[in-house]
Amino acid sequence: GSSGLIPMPRV
């Protein structure tokens, strides 16, 4: 996912 302010899982 993304390692930013908001971690978003890869879907």
Curated annotation (Swiss-Prot):
<keyword id="KW-0964">Secreted</keyword>
<dbReference type="Pfam" id="PF08259">
    <property type="entry name" value="Periviscerokin"/>
</dbReference>
<comment type="function">
    <text>Mediates visceral muscle contractile activity (myotropic activity).</text>
</comment>
<dbReference type="GO" id="GO:0007218">
    <property type="term" value="P:neuropeptide signaling pathway"/>
</dbReference>
<keyword id="KW-0027">Amidation</keyword>
<dbReference type="InterPro" id="IPR013231">
    <property type="entry name" value="Periviscerokinin"/>
</dbReference>
<protein>
    <recommendedName>
        <fullName>Periviscerokinin-2</fullName>
    </recommendedName>
</protein>
<dbReference type="GO" id="GO:0005576">
    <property type="term" value="C:extracellular region"/>
</dbReference>
<feature type="modified residue" description="Valine amide">
    <location>
        <position position="11"/>
    </location>
</feature>
<keyword id="KW-0527">Neuropeptide</keyword>
<comment type="similarity">
    <text>Belongs to the periviscerokinin family.</text>
</comment>
